[in-house]
Design a protein with these regions (language model features):
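Single-stranded nucleic acid-binding surfaces, predominantly the OB-fold ssDNA-binding core
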Residues: 1-210
Length: 210
């Protein structure tokens, strides 16, 4: 399972890459949270299936994937993005959103997999607890049943964090939440910092077979 439903403003539509004769585009989707904070979600999609324009409000369905690329310094960077099937949704997206527009959140995700990395439960100075972990999601795509493995960073807070801390590597888990972005400072040298954007799954609830 790996499905995300999003609503937001699409911006910065530009060419991404090609596979064979198929061209792909990329864009940013600006998704507002209830508190007014905006998440910037990376999108990928087939060029021919894109009928959207800059700053248009769109409603879409897709899945969350990871891609590891090598930087100029030789290090690897993992990008998290949403691949959306504008041309082949699993259900009638426009009709569904029209009928449920006022009931739907802007950002809803369900994804399952196995925990491949889990940190210790942390208690912050304000007393709140959180935990970071990564799940490996196996997605079957295309007519040839091609398998795609993605590694998705997750964060949970409060009781959910305390419960997840009881799990271990290889535990099977289904997460219900949303995809969010956050800025952080990366130290480049003793005097220089660079502002970067990370993406992670915010866990609202979860179930496990363990």
């Amino acid at each position: 399972m790996n499905e995300i439903k999003l609503r937001g403003l699409i911006r910065d539509i530009k060419p991404s890459h090609s596979i064979g004769d198929i061209e792909y585009n990329k864009a940013n989707l600006i998704v507002s949270r209830d508190d007014g904070i905006e998440d910037v979600i990376n999108l990928r999609f087939k060029k021919f299936s894109n009928s959207y324009k800059e700053d248009q409000e769109v409603e879409l369905v897709g899945n969350v994937r990871s891609y590891s690329r090598q930087l100029d310094n030789g290090k690897n960077k993992v990008d998290i993005y949403v691949f959306t099937y504008f041309d082949k949704p699993t259900w009638d997206v426009p009709q569904y959103f029209e009928e449920h527009h006022d009931k739907l959140p802007n950002n809803e995700l369900v994804v399952d997999g196995r925990i491949c990395k889990i940190d210790e439960l942390r208690t912050l100075s304000n007393g709140k607890k959180n935990i970071h972990f990564i799940i490996a999601n196996n997605l079957v795509i295309g007519d040839g049943n091609q398998k795609l493995n993605s590694y998705l960073p997750c964060i949970a807070w409060g009781k959910a964090a305390a419960d997840i801390a009881k799990l271990s590597v290889n535990s099977k888990i289904t997460v219900y939440g949303k995809l969010q972005s956050r800025e952080y400072r990366k130290k480049i040298s003793d005097e220089e910092f660079e502002i970067r954007v990370a993406h992670e799954v915010f866990v609202k609830s979860f179930t496990t077979d363990d």
